[in-house]
Swiss-Prot record:
Its EC number is 5.2.1.8. One of its GO terms (biological process) is RNA splicing. GO terms for molecular function: peptidyl-prolyl cis-trans isomerase activity. The gene is Ppwd1. It comes from the Eukaryota. It is an enzyme of class 5 (isomerase). This is Peptidylprolyl isomerase domain and WD repeat-containing protein 1.
Length: 646
């Protein structure tokens, strides 16, 4: 029996090794047959040969899933770690969309809408509309990029022709709207648009080019206020969600507003669409892949879920909750502890003011990647391999909210490029390259930011500022500028007289005029006299400028706080750098610190406005005094006697 089982095992192994044709299989069957015949003649030899169980073949290691041509796809996505340009609105920007007709449309909290045109490199301003008298609740662009609409708390819907950048219709809704979406596809007779009532689950369908009379009303489809309405133009179906976590499929006028017939399910229990209701969450953003087969969502529980549209089955879940980020920071530090704490505070404020609902998710043109904003920056996730392949803007001091993705070549040429043109070495044709761009909004910012494949320092002129001031200053800003005394109030050098010696400082009034003015005026007025170095960290920095000595006090010469003044030539790249202390973005008061080592992680977070030119040994002596390990406060006070401004 041992011989037979051994022969069978050997035969099976030979068959696995020779998967080709039947001839090899027959040959491998003959060989063990001879071995059996020989073993009958010599049993002793056979017993020695087949003693014990045969070794099991090693199982093949599971191959890691790989997306073919992933590098090519990533080359068509923005890759710069910092934003290249930013442009302004008068108020906080809340919404941004990108159309297939190469337009970018931004909307701000004060009801204003701006149209921008994507050009070969960058964008250009087109037109400005005062769209609503109040807050804009939602905006939408049609699937072919021809029509744009916005709804606001003035109970109105405004409809725009995108290509001609003109307002073509205005609908008086008679209720406070919540969400809106174009639900028609190219070729439909009616340009239908859906709008939901903010406080109920009703959905009203209108003719976008018609009057105020609704074509249809869904009054029983949802029982809770809606959070999203999105059209899947490939399958001509609409998906809507409400605050109870329910997700519904329906169609527009061509299919008489019924359940779509082209999906592979009839009862919702056969799908995973109850996932949100089970988790007591609801979708705050929904988008479809270009082929219409995937639905990407962001939930109120900060989880990214990806479903298959036709079956409603859950495909992927990515946890982006604050507890996950805290655990990740503890396992492997993602950010300096001080910066991580600041960003966590911003995240909690997001939840407090219910701004998480403005964060959205988008697919790229291939449908293999999703992009969305997190506290670490813009994540690019490969949904096929389940990996985060890129993070943009990690070192930026902004919390990305809504984003829109442009891919391709903006400038349309008269004739399509042939294979011969593509293969040629014509330098003119080679200059026509794609300019993938992410346009995003930020929390509490009146700017939108553009991430491309170019870093800020790669721009044509080294002196060009990436933050473009395309809006006129407000009356308050003009008054503050005219009241300032100008050059008399600032200086380019000062001497800090401390109880341990003098520190000579060079100031930078040209690069950061407001910060230097604040320091000089405070110094001349004797504000810093008697202030202690209330926080000293050996091998890092010494901090002062707080009249209370607790680290919680101090204000600017204008009262309250003032904005950051970052400059590309002023970095924390060397010791003895003079920089402003703050409690977050644009919260400068009177406190400042002097570093004793290079601290590059503070760049673009704290304003550098001076360098120590003499008295470095005094700074070192102060940094080496004994301090309370819990509070970093010296046991014996080291104080500023006064500051002489030259």
């Amino acid at each position: 029996m041992a011989t037979e089982s051994g022969s069978d095992s050997q035969l099976r192994r030979r068959r696995r090794r020779d998967p080709e044709g039947s001839e090899k299989t027959e040959l491998s069957e003959r060989e063990p047959a001879l071995a059996v015949a020989g073993s009958e003649e010599n049993d002793d030899e056979n017993e020695e040969r087949w003693v014990g169980p045969l070794p099991v073949e090693a199982t093949l290691a599971k191959k890691r899933k790989v997306l073919e041509f992933e590098r090519v796809y990533l080359d068509n996505l923005p890759s710069a770690s910092m934003y290249e340009r930013s442009y302004m609105h008068r108020d906080v920007i809340t919404h941004v969309v990108c159309t297939k007709t190469d337009f970018i449309i931004t909307a701000s909290h004060d009801g204003h809408v701006k149209f921008w045109k994507k050009i070969e490199e960058g964008i250009e301003f087109v037109k400005h509309f005062r769209s609503h008298l109040g807050v804009i609740e939602s905006i939408a662009v049609s699937s072919e990029g021809a029509l744009f609409c916005s709804v606001g708390d003035d109970k109105a819907m405004k409809v725009f022709d995108v290509v001609n950048f003109d307002m073509i219709n205005m609908l008086k809704l008679g209720y406070f709207p919540g969400q809106c979406e174009w639900i028609y596809c190219p070729g439909d007779a009616i340009s239908s648009v859906a709008a939901s009532e903010k406080s109920t689950g009703k959905i009203f369908i209108y003719d976008g080019r018609g009057d105020n009379q609704p074509l249809h009303i869904f009054d029983k489809l949802h029982v809770s206020p809606l959070t999203q309405i999105r059209l899947n133009p490939v399958y001509k179906a609409v998906v809507s969600s409400d605050k109870s976590g329910m997700i519904e499929y329906w169609t527009g006028p061509p299919h008489e507003y019924k359940f779509p017939k082209n999906v592979n399910w009839e009862y919702k229990t056969d799908t995973d669409l109850y996932e949100f209701a089970k988790c007591k969450a609801y979708p705050t953003s929904i988008c479809f892949s270009p082929d219409g087969k995937k639905i990407a969502t962001i939930g109120s529980d900060r989880k990214v879920r990806i479903f298959r549209f036709l079956t409603g089955k859950l495909m992927r879940v990515f946890d982006e909750s604050l507890s996950m980020f805290t655990e990740l920071q503890q396992m492997r530090q993602q950010l300096p502890d001080m910066e991580f704490g600041r960003r966590m505070a911003v995240e909690r404020e997001l939840e407090k003011v219910d701004a998480v609902r403005l964060v959205n998710i988008v697919f790229d043109e291939t449908g293999h990647f999703v992009l969305y904003g997190t506290m670490l920056g813009i994540k690019v996730i490969n949904v096929e391999t389940n990996r985060c392949v890129r993070i943009l803007g990690k070192q930026e001091n902004i919390r990305v909210m809504q984003l829109a993705l442009f891919q391709g070549i903006a400038k349309k040429h008269r004739a399509a490029a042939t294979i011969e043109m593509k293969a040629s070495e014509n330098p003119v044709l080679q200059n026509i390259q794609a300019d993938p761009t992410i346009v995003c909004t930020s929390f509490k910012k009146n700017r939108f930011y553009m991430f491309t494949k170019r870093e800020p320092e790669d721009t044509k002129t080294a002196d060009s500022d990436r933050d473009v001031f395309n809006e006129k200053p407000s009356k308050e800003e003009v008054m503050a500028a005219t009241q300032a005394e100008g050059p008399k109030r600032v200086s380019d050098s000062a001497i800090v007289h401390t109880s341990m010696g003098d520190i000579h400082i060079k100031l930078f009034p040209v690069e950061c005029p407001k910060t230097v003015e604040n320091f000089c005026v405070h110094s001349r007025n004797g504000y810093y006299n008697g202030h202690t170095f209330h926080r000293i960290i050996k091998g890092f920095m010494i901090q002062t400028g707080d009249p209370t000595g607790t680290g919680m006090g101090g204000e600017s010469i204008w009262g309250g706080e003032f904005e950051d003044e970052f400059h590309s030539t002023l970095r924390h790249d060397r010791p003895y750098t003079l920089s402003m202390a703050n409690a977050g973005s644009n919260t400068n008061g009177s406190q400042f610190f002097i570093t004793v080592v290079p601290t590059p992680w503070l760049d673009n977070k704290h304003t550098v406005f001076g360098r120590v030119t003499k008295g470095m040994e005094v700074v070192q002596r102060i940094s080496n005094v004994k301090v309370n390990p819990k509070t970093d406060k010296p046991y014996e006070d080291v104080s500023i006697i006064n500051i002489t401004v030259k």
